[in-house]
Amino acid sequence: MRYKKLYPAVICFCVFLAAIGLVLGDPSTVLPGLWKIIVTEDALITDYVKIAGVSAALVNSALVTLVSLLLLYLSKEPPNGFTLVELGLMAGFSLFGKNIVNIWPIIAGTFLYAKARREPFGKYVSVSLLATALAPVVSYVALDNGFGNLWWGIAVGLLIGFVLPPLSAYTYKIQNGMNLYNMGFACGLLAM
């Protein structure tokens, strides 16, 4: 199996990310920085390095990537090139907009969709991770937009996670499967 060492390699990558974060910045700022990341309204593009420092931003990226890896592993998703792309996207976008808290309502929404369809979550775990492209919307609604609150943020996240699996299947058909990032198109349609 060509990708059998993918999971250990990604774990090493996450440890490296966290270690570099601790070396480049002050380790005592990591937990307050993570808290600042979590409670920041993520409007448009929010640079976590600017908000909380390099240490907290890299540790956030490591945590989000580890959670993603754990979900893929527990769902028995066979590792492949697309798995690596998903993990790379999760790591990269965890530096701005996506954090260890705001991804959960969307993942839970996709889990509920799988249960409603009476199908294993493993079938939708990739869609779930890519759907977290809209995780900043959860933070925006939950934290500071004038009309939302925590419960509205969770509800919006659940709705996003529930709607994106069938929407992404539809956009895949529109594009004839030619685009690796068909979830980007689906997320864009839903975000509008």
What is the predicted role of each segment?
Residues 1-192:
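Alpha-helical multipass membrane-protein architecture
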